[in-house]
Amino acid sequence: MKAMLLHKFGEPLRLEDMDVPKVGVGQVLVKVDYAGVCHTDLSVRSGAIFNRISSSKPTLPLVIGHEIAGEVVELGGNVEGFKKSDKVLIDPWIGDGSCHYCKIGEDQYCDNPKWLGINVNGGYGEYVLVPDYRYMFKLRNLSTSTASPLACSGVTAYRALRLANLDPSKSVMIIGAGGGLGSIAVQIAKAIHGSFIIGVDVSEEGLKLATNLGADYVTSKVDEEEVRKITTGRGVDAIIDFVGSEFTTSNYYTLLAKLGRYVKVGTYGGGLPHDAGLRLHSMGWQFIGTLTGNRKDFLEVLELAENGKIKPMITKVLSLEEANDALDNLEKGKVSGRQVLKVT
Protein backbone atom coordinates (compact mmCIF):
# COMPACT_ATOMS: atom_id res chain seq x y z
CA MET A 1 0.00 0.00 0.00
CA LYS A 2 1.04 3.62 -0.54
CA ALA A 3 1.24 5.96 2.43
CA MET A 4 2.68 9.32 3.43
CA LEU A 5 5.15 8.53 6.20
CA LEU A 6 6.65 10.80 8.85
CA HIS A 7 10.27 9.72 9.45
CA LYS A 8 11.51 12.70 11.46
CA PHE A 9 9.65 15.43 13.30
CA GLY A 10 9.81 18.73 11.46
CA GLU A 11 10.46 17.18 8.06
CA PRO A 12 8.06 16.65 5.12
CA LEU A 13 6.16 13.39 4.82
CA ARG A 14 7.47 10.83 2.33
CA LEU A 15 5.37 8.83 -0.11
CA GLU A 16 6.38 5.19 0.29
CA ASP A 17 5.16 1.62 -0.11
CA MET A 18 4.45 -0.33 3.05
CA ASP A 19 2.76 -3.58 4.00
CA VAL A 20 -1.00 -3.70 4.39
CA PRO A 21 -1.74 -4.16 8.13
CA LYS A 22 -2.69 -7.62 9.42
CA VAL A 23 -6.10 -7.87 11.08
CA GLY A 24 -6.44 -9.32 14.58
CA VAL A 25 -9.34 -10.18 16.87
CA GLY A 26 -11.79 -7.30 17.24
CA GLN A 27 -10.00 -5.31 14.57
CA VAL A 28 -11.07 -4.06 11.14
CA LEU A 29 -9.14 -3.11 8.02
CA VAL A 30 -10.57 -0.07 6.24
CA LYS A 31 -9.66 1.16 2.78
CA VAL A 32 -9.31 4.90 3.21
CA ASP A 33 -11.42 6.98 0.82
CA TYR A 34 -10.81 10.43 2.32
CA ALA A 35 -8.76 11.90 5.15
CA GLY A 36 -9.31 15.39 6.54
CA VAL A 37 -6.34 17.70 7.07
CA CYS A 38 -6.30 19.10 10.60
CA HIS A 39 -4.06 21.42 12.62
CA THR A 40 -3.34 18.42 14.83
CA ASP A 41 -1.70 16.78 11.81
CA LEU A 42 0.57 19.82 11.57
CA SER A 43 1.41 19.47 15.24
CA VAL A 44 2.22 15.78 14.78
CA ARG A 45 4.43 16.50 11.77
CA SER A 46 6.40 19.09 13.76
CA GLY A 47 6.36 17.00 16.96
CA ALA A 48 5.00 19.94 18.97
CA ILE A 49 1.97 17.98 20.15
CA PHE A 50 4.19 15.62 22.11
CA ASN A 51 5.39 18.46 24.31
CA ARG A 52 1.86 18.34 25.76
CA ILE A 53 1.21 14.60 25.60
CA SER A 54 4.68 13.10 25.88
CA SER A 55 3.33 9.74 27.10
CA SER A 56 1.75 9.20 23.66
CA LYS A 57 4.86 9.86 21.59
CA PRO A 58 4.98 7.39 18.69
CA THR A 59 7.72 5.29 17.23
CA LEU A 60 8.62 6.64 13.79
CA PRO A 61 7.97 6.22 10.91
CA LEU A 62 4.29 7.03 11.36
CA VAL A 63 1.33 7.40 9.01
CA ILE A 64 -0.39 10.55 10.27
CA GLY A 65 -4.02 11.63 9.71
CA HIS A 66 -6.95 11.09 12.06
CA GLU A 67 -10.06 12.31 10.18
CA ILE A 68 -10.74 9.08 8.31
CA ALA A 69 -13.67 7.70 6.32
CA GLY A 70 -13.64 4.70 4.03
CA GLU A 71 -14.81 1.18 3.26
CA VAL A 72 -14.54 -2.00 5.33
CA VAL A 73 -12.45 -4.59 3.47
CA GLU A 74 -11.54 -7.15 6.15
CA LEU A 75 -12.88 -8.06 9.60
CA GLY A 76 -11.11 -9.87 12.42
CA GLY A 77 -12.73 -12.35 14.76
CA ASN A 78 -15.46 -11.26 17.18
CA VAL A 79 -16.39 -8.19 15.15
CA GLU A 80 -20.14 -7.54 15.28
CA GLY A 81 -22.43 -5.24 13.33
CA PHE A 82 -20.21 -4.66 10.30
CA LYS A 83 -19.62 -6.37 6.97
CA LYS A 84 -17.33 -5.94 4.00
CA SER A 85 -18.18 -2.93 1.79
CA ASP A 86 -19.75 -0.94 4.66
CA LYS A 87 -18.91 2.75 4.41
CA VAL A 88 -17.70 3.98 7.79
CA LEU A 89 -16.42 6.97 9.72
CA ILE A 90 -13.75 6.17 12.29
CA ASP A 91 -13.51 7.68 15.75
CA PRO A 92 -9.72 8.09 16.05
CA TRP A 93 -9.65 8.67 19.82
CA ILE A 94 -9.37 5.01 20.82
CA GLY A 95 -9.04 4.05 24.47
CA ASP A 96 -7.82 0.84 26.08
CA GLY A 97 -11.15 0.33 27.84
CA SER A 98 -9.60 -0.27 31.25
CA CYS A 99 -8.49 3.10 32.65
CA HIS A 100 -10.66 5.38 34.79
CA TYR A 101 -11.51 7.70 31.91
CA CYS A 102 -12.60 4.91 29.58
CA LYS A 103 -14.80 3.49 32.33
CA ILE A 104 -16.63 6.81 32.73
CA GLY A 105 -17.14 7.15 28.97
CA GLU A 106 -14.41 9.72 28.29
CA ASP A 107 -12.20 7.47 26.15
CA GLN A 108 -10.51 10.45 24.49
CA TYR A 109 -8.68 11.05 27.79
CA CYS A 110 -7.46 7.45 28.08
CA ASP A 111 -4.21 6.95 29.98
CA ASN A 112 -2.98 4.49 27.34
CA PRO A 113 -4.60 5.64 24.10
CA LYS A 114 -4.28 4.42 20.54
CA TRP A 115 -4.91 7.64 18.66
CA LEU A 116 -5.00 7.05 14.94
CA GLY A 117 -2.47 9.20 13.13
CA ILE A 118 -0.95 10.43 16.37
CA ASN A 119 0.66 7.46 18.08
CA VAL A 120 -0.51 4.62 15.81
CA ASN A 121 -0.79 4.64 12.02
CA GLY A 122 -3.62 6.74 10.65
CA GLY A 123 -5.35 7.82 7.48
CA TYR A 124 -2.70 9.26 5.14
CA GLY A 125 -2.39 5.83 3.57
CA GLU A 126 -4.49 3.52 1.41
CA TYR A 127 -5.47 1.28 4.33
CA VAL A 128 -5.85 1.82 8.06
CA LEU A 129 -6.17 -0.76 10.81
CA VAL A 130 -8.87 0.11 13.33
CA PRO A 131 -7.71 -1.45 16.64
CA ASP A 132 -11.25 -1.74 18.04
CA TYR A 133 -14.33 -2.05 15.81
CA ARG A 134 -16.49 -0.26 18.39
CA TYR A 135 -14.87 2.99 17.26
CA MET A 136 -16.38 2.75 13.76
CA PHE A 137 -19.74 4.16 12.70
CA LYS A 138 -21.71 3.26 9.58
CA LEU A 139 -22.61 6.02 7.17
CA ARG A 140 -26.17 6.17 5.86
CA ASN A 141 -26.66 9.34 3.82
CA LEU A 142 -23.24 10.96 3.99
CA SER A 143 -20.47 10.48 1.47
CA THR A 144 -17.07 9.56 2.87
CA SER A 145 -15.66 12.87 1.62
CA THR A 146 -18.23 14.90 3.53
CA ALA A 147 -18.04 12.69 6.61
CA SER A 148 -14.28 12.55 7.17
CA PRO A 149 -13.85 15.97 8.89
CA LEU A 150 -16.54 15.10 11.42
CA ALA A 151 -14.10 12.72 13.14
CA CYS A 152 -12.21 15.64 14.68
CA SER A 153 -13.47 19.06 13.61
CA GLY A 154 -17.10 18.04 14.00
CA VAL A 155 -16.93 16.23 17.33
CA THR A 156 -14.48 18.74 18.83
CA ALA A 157 -16.66 21.71 17.94
CA TYR A 158 -19.75 19.90 19.20
CA ARG A 159 -18.15 19.16 22.57
CA ALA A 160 -16.88 22.73 22.97
CA LEU A 161 -20.36 24.15 22.37
CA ARG A 162 -21.91 21.65 24.76
CA LEU A 163 -19.48 22.78 27.46
CA ALA A 164 -20.43 26.40 26.74
CA ASN A 165 -23.96 25.70 28.02
CA LEU A 166 -25.70 27.71 25.31
CA ASP A 167 -29.38 28.35 24.65
CA PRO A 168 -31.39 30.83 22.52
CA SER A 169 -31.10 33.54 25.18
CA LYS A 170 -27.30 33.52 25.08
CA SER A 171 -24.55 34.84 22.84
CA VAL A 172 -21.35 33.13 21.78
CA MET A 173 -18.14 34.43 20.23
CA ILE A 174 -16.40 31.90 17.98
CA ILE A 175 -12.72 32.68 17.42
CA GLY A 176 -11.53 31.13 14.17
CA ALA A 177 -15.08 31.05 12.82
CA GLY A 178 -14.01 30.46 9.22
CA GLY A 179 -11.75 27.48 9.87
CA GLY A 180 -12.47 23.77 9.84
CA LEU A 181 -13.72 23.67 13.43
CA GLY A 182 -15.16 27.18 13.52
CA SER A 183 -17.30 26.69 10.43
CA ILE A 184 -18.90 23.60 11.98
CA ALA A 185 -19.28 25.41 15.32
CA VAL A 186 -21.21 28.26 13.69
CA GLN A 187 -23.65 25.74 12.22
CA ILE A 188 -24.12 23.89 15.51
CA ALA A 189 -24.53 27.09 17.53
CA LYS A 190 -27.25 28.28 15.16
CA ALA A 191 -29.08 25.03 14.37
CA ILE A 192 -28.94 23.34 17.76
CA HIS A 193 -28.54 26.07 20.36
CA GLY A 194 -30.17 29.00 18.55
CA SER A 195 -27.68 31.43 20.05
CA PHE A 196 -26.55 34.86 18.83
CA ILE A 197 -23.21 34.27 17.10
CA ILE A 198 -20.25 36.63 16.83
CA GLY A 199 -17.71 35.21 14.39
CA VAL A 200 -14.07 36.28 14.56
CA ASP A 201 -11.55 35.42 11.84
CA VAL A 202 -8.46 37.06 10.38
CA SER A 203 -9.39 36.41 6.74
CA GLU A 204 -12.14 37.96 4.64
CA GLU A 205 -12.83 34.55 3.13
CA GLY A 206 -13.33 33.08 6.59
CA LEU A 207 -15.67 35.90 7.60
CA LYS A 208 -17.76 35.42 4.45
CA LEU A 209 -18.01 31.70 5.15
CA ALA A 210 -19.08 32.32 8.76
CA THR A 211 -21.73 34.79 7.60
CA ASN A 212 -23.08 32.36 5.02
CA LEU A 213 -23.32 29.67 7.68
CA GLY A 214 -25.38 31.79 10.06
CA ALA A 215 -23.13 34.07 12.12
CA ASP A 216 -25.06 37.18 13.16
CA TYR A 217 -22.04 39.50 13.36
CA VAL A 218 -18.52 38.97 12.03
CA THR A 219 -15.30 40.90 12.44
CA SER A 220 -11.56 40.58 11.97
CA LYS A 221 -10.83 43.20 14.65
CA VAL A 222 -12.79 42.86 17.86
CA ASP A 223 -13.97 46.15 19.35
CA GLU A 224 -15.06 45.77 22.98
CA GLU A 225 -17.49 48.68 22.84
CA GLU A 226 -19.18 47.27 19.75
CA VAL A 227 -19.42 43.78 21.27
CA ARG A 228 -21.07 45.16 24.39
CA LYS A 229 -23.45 47.19 22.25
CA ILE A 230 -24.70 44.14 20.33
CA THR A 231 -24.98 42.07 23.53
CA THR A 232 -27.17 44.61 25.38
CA GLY A 233 -24.22 45.79 27.43
CA ARG A 234 -23.52 42.47 29.15
CA GLY A 235 -20.79 40.97 27.01
CA VAL A 236 -20.82 37.49 25.53
CA ASP A 237 -22.06 34.49 27.48
CA ALA A 238 -19.45 32.18 25.97
CA ILE A 239 -16.25 32.32 23.96
CA ILE A 240 -15.10 29.31 21.96
CA ASP A 241 -11.43 29.81 21.15
CA PHE A 242 -10.31 27.59 18.28
CA VAL A 243 -6.99 29.46 18.07
CA GLY A 244 -5.76 29.58 21.66
CA SER A 245 -2.88 31.97 21.00
CA GLU A 246 -1.31 34.38 23.47
CA PHE A 247 -3.21 37.18 21.74
CA THR A 248 -6.65 35.57 21.88
CA THR A 249 -6.42 34.35 25.46
CA SER A 250 -5.01 37.67 26.69
CA ASN A 251 -7.40 40.00 24.88
CA TYR A 252 -10.82 38.40 24.56
CA TYR A 253 -11.69 37.07 28.03
CA THR A 254 -12.61 40.62 29.14
CA LEU A 255 -15.60 40.41 26.76
CA LEU A 256 -17.23 37.71 28.88
CA ALA A 257 -20.46 38.52 30.66
CA LYS A 258 -20.90 37.58 34.29
CA LEU A 259 -21.15 33.78 34.59
CA GLY A 260 -19.51 33.54 31.16
CA ARG A 261 -17.60 30.50 29.94
CA TYR A 262 -14.33 30.57 27.99
CA VAL A 263 -13.81 27.24 26.22
CA LYS A 264 -10.25 26.86 24.92
CA VAL A 265 -9.73 24.38 22.10
CA GLY A 266 -6.81 25.85 20.13
CA THR A 267 -3.26 25.19 21.26
CA TYR A 268 -1.22 28.07 19.88
CA GLY A 269 0.57 28.89 23.11
CA GLY A 270 -1.91 31.05 25.01
CA GLY A 271 -2.39 30.72 28.76
CA LEU A 272 -4.76 32.12 31.36
CA PRO A 273 -3.77 35.73 32.17
CA HIS A 274 -3.13 36.62 35.81
CA ASP A 275 -5.88 39.24 35.79
CA ALA A 276 -8.41 36.68 34.55
CA GLY A 277 -7.63 34.49 37.54
CA LEU A 278 -8.12 37.40 39.91
CA ARG A 279 -11.57 38.14 38.45
CA LEU A 280 -12.91 34.57 38.43
CA HIS A 281 -14.77 34.98 41.71
CA SER A 282 -16.31 38.40 41.19
CA MET A 283 -17.45 37.59 37.63
CA GLY A 284 -18.34 33.94 38.13
CA TRP A 285 -16.35 33.02 35.04
CA GLN A 286 -15.43 29.49 34.04
CA PHE A 287 -12.36 28.70 31.94
CA ILE A 288 -12.62 25.26 30.36
CA GLY A 289 -10.17 23.25 28.29
CA THR A 290 -11.30 20.50 25.95
CA LEU A 291 -9.42 18.04 23.78
CA THR A 292 -12.27 16.56 21.74
CA GLY A 293 -15.54 14.76 22.32
CA ASN A 294 -16.39 11.26 23.51
CA ARG A 295 -18.25 8.54 21.64
CA LYS A 296 -21.62 9.94 22.72
CA ASP A 297 -20.66 13.31 21.23
CA PHE A 298 -19.41 11.50 18.12
CA LEU A 299 -22.74 9.74 17.59
CA GLU A 300 -24.71 12.93 18.15
CA VAL A 301 -22.69 15.05 15.73
CA LEU A 302 -22.80 12.29 13.12
CA GLU A 303 -26.58 12.16 13.48
CA LEU A 304 -26.80 15.92 12.96
CA ALA A 305 -24.84 15.59 9.74
CA GLU A 306 -26.80 12.56 8.56
CA ASN A 307 -30.01 14.56 9.04
CA GLY A 308 -28.66 17.57 7.13
CA LYS A 309 -28.47 19.92 10.13
CA ILE A 310 -24.72 20.52 9.69
CA LYS A 311 -22.19 19.96 6.92
CA PRO A 312 -18.39 20.17 6.97
CA MET A 313 -17.24 22.95 4.66
CA ILE A 314 -14.80 21.18 2.34
CA THR A 315 -13.07 23.88 0.34
CA LYS A 316 -10.30 21.88 -1.32
CA VAL A 317 -9.71 18.25 -2.30
CA LEU A 318 -6.11 17.13 -2.85
CA SER A 319 -4.45 13.82 -3.65
CA LEU A 320 -2.57 11.71 -1.12
CA GLU A 321 0.69 12.75 -2.77
CA GLU A 322 -0.19 16.40 -2.08
CA ALA A 323 -0.43 15.90 1.70
CA ASN A 324 2.59 18.12 2.39
CA ASP A 325 1.07 20.87 0.24
CA ALA A 326 -2.16 20.63 2.22
CA LEU A 327 -0.30 20.88 5.52
CA ASP A 328 1.76 23.81 4.25
CA ASN A 329 -1.42 25.60 3.15
CA LEU A 330 -2.79 25.18 6.65
CA GLU A 331 0.41 26.33 8.31
CA LYS A 332 0.47 29.48 6.17
CA GLY A 333 -3.13 30.37 6.99
CA LYS A 334 -4.33 29.88 3.42
CA VAL A 335 -7.30 27.67 4.31
CA SER A 336 -10.89 28.43 5.19
CA GLY A 337 -13.17 25.50 5.90
CA ARG A 338 -11.53 22.08 5.55
CA GLN A 339 -9.12 20.47 3.12
CA VAL A 340 -9.42 16.72 2.53
CA LEU A 341 -7.16 14.20 0.83
CA LYS A 342 -8.66 11.79 -1.70
CA VAL A 343 -6.62 8.76 -0.74
CA THR A 344 -8.05 5.96 -2.94
UniProtKB/Swiss-Prot annotation:
Zn(2+) 2 binds at residues 96, 99, 102, 110. InterPro entries: ADH-like_C, ADH-like_N, ADH_Zn_CS, GroES-like_sf, NAD(P)-bd_dom_sf, PKS_ER. It catalyses: a primary alcohol + NAD(+) = an aldehyde + NADH + H(+); a secondary alcohol + NAD(+) = a ketone + NADH + H(+). CDD domains: arabinose_DH_like. Its EC number is 1.1.1.1. GO terms for molecular function: alcohol dehydrogenase (NAD+) activity; zinc ion binding. Homodimer and homotetramer. This is NAD-dependent alcohol dehydrogenase. It comes from Sulfolobus acidocaldarius (strain ATCC 33909 / DSM 639 / JCM 8929 / NBRC 15157 / NCIMB 11770). The lineage of its organism: Archaea, Thermoproteota, Thermoprotei, Sulfolobales, Sulfolobaceae. The gene is adh.
